[in-house]
Regions:
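One face of beta-strands
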Residues: 24-42, 117-123
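Solvent-exposed coil/turn segments that connect beta secondary-structure elements
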Residues: 33-35, 43-45, 92, 145-149
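C-terminal motif of bacterial Sec signal peptides marking the signal peptidase cleavage site
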Residues: 18-20
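Bacterial N-terminal signal peptides that target proteins for export
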Residues: 1-9
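Structured domain cores in non-transmembrane regions
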Residues: 43-114
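C-terminal membrane-anchoring or membrane-association module
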Residues: 198-210
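C-terminal cell-surface addressing/anchoring modules of secreted/extracellular proteins
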Residues: 183-200
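Intrinsically disordered, low-complexity linkers and stems that provide flexible hinges
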Residues: 108-184
């Protein structure tokens, strides 16, 4: 199903390129265990939508919401006179997120990991090269919802754990970097942890009696 979800994302991006639409929103939500969801939204003006519908001879199901695989949600959203097609794809770990990212040309992952109680996000996006999927955009918004409080970042905007970058179009390679805390909520200490402590105490007690 992961391949199907990737195809859905690529179809949305391909439609954007064909229609001449220049707006993209990417939002990645990462949980403390590395799972999460990736949202990619493509915005079409009323004129762009009309032209695309004429090309495809399809005035209904503009975002193809009925063709999404079970693990992918496709949402059609109206914002004033713009139509946004948004894909929501879950991922079970950071390796799956890496695979989703790498389906697009023009993105390089430097670091994407949870280690030593910290989440590190370091990604380059190419907004200039002709071979990059991101070079056609006049508006690009990239957001990451961190698993914990931000420690260090180079984002343009911060709202609690949500970081947002607004790269200048055709400005070259943009580095998106952030580091955050990772809550320990993913590990349930009792009763398992308490049991381990109990076993350790018993071993220590009997060890002293010898």
């Amino acid at each position: 199903m992961k391949c199907q979800s990737i195809k859905i994302i690529l179809l949305v991006v391909s439609a954007l390129l064909l229609a001449g639409c220049h707006k993209l929103e990417v939002m990645t939500k990462v949980e403390s265990n590395g799972s999460g969801e990736l949202q990619m939204g493509v915005g079409f003006s009323a004129e762009e939508r009309t032209n695309l519908e004429k090309q495809n001879n399809n005035a209904q199901g503009f975002c193809n919401t009925s063709q999404a695989p079970p693990n992918v949600t496709v949402i059609e959203e109206q914002r004033s006179d713009e139509t946004w097609c948004i894909t929501v794809t879950p991922f079970k770990d950071l390796e799956e997120l890496r695979s989703l990212y790498e389906q697009s040309q023009g993105i390089k992952i430097n670091r994407l990991e949870i280690s030593d109680g910290k989440f590190t996000y370091d990604v380059d996006v190419d907004t200039l090269s002709e071979t990059s999927d991101f070079s056609v955009f006049t508006v690009l918004t990239w957001s990451v919802i961190l698993p914990g409080a931000p420690i260090e970042h180079n984002a343009d905007q911060v709202d609690a754990n949500t970081l947002t970058w607004n790269p200048t179009p055709e400005s070259g390679i943009i580095n998106l970097r952030a580091e955050s805390e990772v809550p320990r909520g993913g590990f349930s200490f009792p009763p398992c942890g308490a049991a381990l402590i109990g076993v350790g105490a018993v071993i220590l007690f009997f060890g002293r009696r010898k």
